């Protein structure tokens, strides 16, 4: 694949074991839990050749989102405090709201689009999205773009 290859976001559940293990090796190395590639591949149970084959082609989504502006689309229950709890999660993660737009509520729900600067965020995007999704009144969250 060339440098201009297309990028895709793929759910972890459908990744092959080799790709998952490659990501785990990279995580161990970046965290400093292991010192060498050889040590990491032995711990994870993947061959060095498989690691080298995939290492430049598989990355966690958070690698591409850190320090960028992400745009989220949400469907929220039209209840007091729901949007406020979303904004609290953003603030507690040290995200910075760039834009926010809420539609008029209809049939008990409202659509909200929020653009967030992730430069200073102190948690991974995955954890951030899980935290948002777990808030009362959140029905749906989608990443629209970066």
Curated annotation (Swiss-Prot):
User: Signal sequence: where?
Assistant: none
Q: Which InterPro entries match?
A: ACT-like_dom_sf (IPR045865), ACT_dom (IPR002912), UPF0735_ACT_dom-cont (IPR008310)
Domain ACT spans what residues? 71-146
Q: Its family?
A: Belongs to the UPF0735 family.
Query: What is the name listed in the Swiss-Prot or TrEMBL entry for this protein?
Result: UPF0735 ACT domain-containing protein Teth39_0139
The taxonomic lineage of its organism, from the top, reads: Bacteria, Bacillati, Bacillota, Clostridia, Thermoanaerobacterales
């Amino acid at each position: 694949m060339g440098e201009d290859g297309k990028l895709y976001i793929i759910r972890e559940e459908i990744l092959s074991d080799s790709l998952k293990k490659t990501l785990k090796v990279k995580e161990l190395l970046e965290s400093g839990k292991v010192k060498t590639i050889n040590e990491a591949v032995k711990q994870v149970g993947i061959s060095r050749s498989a690691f080298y084959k995939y290492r430049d082609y598989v990355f966690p989504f958070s690698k591409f989102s850190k320090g960028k502006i992400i745009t989220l689309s949400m469907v929220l229950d039209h209840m007091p405090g729901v949007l406020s709890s979303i904004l609290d999660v953003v603030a507690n993660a040290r995200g910075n709201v760039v834009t926010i737009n809420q539609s008029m509520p209809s049939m008990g729900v409202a659509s909200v689009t929020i653009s967030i600067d992730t430069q200073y965020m102190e948690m991974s995007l995955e954890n951030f999205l899980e935290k948002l999704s777990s808030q009362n009144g959140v029905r749906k969250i989608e990443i629209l773009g970066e």
